[in-house]
């Protein structure tokens, strides 16, 4: 399922600018989730011509090319709203939470071995398997807007990577926090006087 968000408040064009000023940035710990040979690492382009603060990321001068387009800006084409790999990972999480370790392992293996045929099968069980599923969601669904919902659903603290330095107060949030609830879009509030903005916005 795909949707074009160009011209809307949810357009990702400015999140993936090829100049290096996009808001979606690769971190060292995310990159390390994937082993050598994993094709998902190829969504990151290292470019010494990048400008701006993102040219000096600890990972190196890198930009996200997950949604490349043929125009002058990345992110102007349709993006996936839901795809099969997310469905597998949703089922893997449900199976792991229900104690069906074999089923969860099989679902994660489908995703991991598609991206890296040489990777070993998942052998973790119990709590360690839940962590494997969570990390696989983070690797596979990166830069698609899922992680904040995953953290919220698991009632976890938000702890950004060690290379989070530009806005220190946003690097760590303890759960619960009103910032885990997203703001209501201005368009919705402006069109209905009975709607009240969520706390903190």
What are the residue ranges of the model-derived segments?
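Short, contiguous acidic/charged loop-to-helix segments that flank catalytic cores in large enzymes
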Residues: 75-79, 118-125
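Flexible, polar/acidic helix-loop-strand segments at domain edges
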Residues: 30-82, 159
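Single conserved hydrophobic/aromatic residue that forms the stacking wall/gate
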Residues: 1-7, 11-12
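Alpha-helical junction/boundary sensor with strong preference for TPR arrays
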Residues: 115-118, 137
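Extended, hydrophobic/aromatic-rich amphipathic alpha-helical segments that build helical scaffolds
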Residues: 6-8, 38, 79-108, 130-142
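Long, intrinsically disordered, low-complexity segments
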Residues: 44, 124-201
